[in-house]
Amino acid sequence: MGWIPCSGKSSGRNKTRRNGDHKLDRKSSDCSVSTSEKSRAKSSLSESKSKGSDHIVAQTFTFSELATATRNFRKECLIGEGGFGRVYKGYLASTSQTAAIKQLDHNGLQGNREFLVEVLMLSLLHHPNLVNLIGYCADGDQRLLVYEYMPLGSLEDHLHDISPGKQPLDWNTRMKIAAGAAKGLEYLHDKTMPPVIYRDLKCSNILLDDDYFPKLSDFGLAKLGPVGDKSHVSTRVMGTYGYCAPEYAMTGQLTLKSDVYSFGVVLLEIITGRKAIDSSRSTGEQNLVAWARPLFKDRRKFSQMADPMLQGQYPPRGLYQALAVAAMCVQEQPNLRPLIADVVTALSYLASQKFDPLAQPVQGSLFAPGTPPRSKRV
């Protein structure tokens, strides 16, 4: 995972399996988490921890154990790479389980601060739609995080980096993923005290198990949200270009609605198959939200926004409703955006309405003439 200030221009991305965005001007003050900040997080979130009787405390691993698990970080075990370092698939003999092991680059984008925040957050928080942190390693200058292994990779892999021969996501699976990701965000916003602002929601941070069940990952940028009569927390602007809420990019004032905006961008990606920022497109279509806003105003154009990879196999009413949710989430004014709980309600309903492509006609004509409808995902 990599970050750049949200207000900056998108830089060229390295072609890796994970985002290769660039983080700029990381200050030395970011390389540690203050004792008061850690204490506040621990005490404030302790109630959430105590409510989860099935919570598993993160284990500590030696570097030697993780080297053995990945066969000395062999290239064949590499499953992801980005500005933070590399992710390997490994087998933990001590727990008899397969795991994803993230080895942070000493000179990479994720410093000690982000490492500590992620260990702290994922040790205290537990929800089916959050990735499970198995443990970590802090031997000498080595920093590694050990997660449950998610065999289908990230949502980004299935929307934008589809390998040859891989079937695109069908409509039902897309709505299932959208609803699950929203539930993970709802847990952070509404089920913890104080709330947690994720701050880095994007397709590459939504991981999928072998049944396309989504889990949010990478909590290095997460912040404790406002409490009492405070409406926001002020922080240096960090995130990924294309996903940041405009008011956060301009002022550094972070709210729960900042996450809702980011979710709206992700939902648009799920529906349209387009990237949040795509420099390969014409000028007016490079920014997904800017491209979508004029189309939101004319329902007759909604079918133009459906991912061509769906080949017209989607429910028109479901498409309109999903786009309506996305449009509300990416409103420029944060007070006009819905609460994430309302988003969960809407998307859970859409996910429950199973679409049968064999029982309904193909919509539109955006796919190539003569292209046969795809078979249903098994």
From Swiss-Prot:
The active site is at D200 (proton acceptor). One of its GO terms (cellular component) is plasma membrane. Residues 73-350 form the Protein kinase domain. Widely expressed. The modification Phosphotyrosine is found at Y147, Y248. Its main location: membrane. Residues 1-49 are annotated as: Disordered. The modification Phosphothreonine is found at T62, T235, T240. Disruption phenotype: No visible phenotype under normal growth conditions, but mutant plants have reduced sensitivity to BR and enhanced sensitivity to BR biosynthetic inhibitor brassinazole (BRZ). One of its GO terms (molecular function) is protein serine/threonine kinase activity. ATP binds at I79, G80, E81, G82, G83, F84, G85, R86, V87, K102. Gene3D superfamilies: Phosphorylase Kinase, domain 1, Transferase(Phosphotransferase) domain 1. SMART domains: S_TKc. It is found in: Cell membrane. Phosphorylated at Ser-43, Ser-46 and Ser-234. It is a lipid-anchor. The modification Phosphoserine is found at S204, S234. Serine/threonine-protein kinase involved in the positive regulation of brassinosteroid (BR) signaling and plant growth. Phosphorylates both BSU1 and BSL1 in vitro. Belongs to the protein kinase superfamily. Ser/Thr protein kinase family. This is Probable serine/threonine-protein kinase PBL7. It comes from Arabidopsis thaliana (Mouse-ear cress). The gene is PBL7.
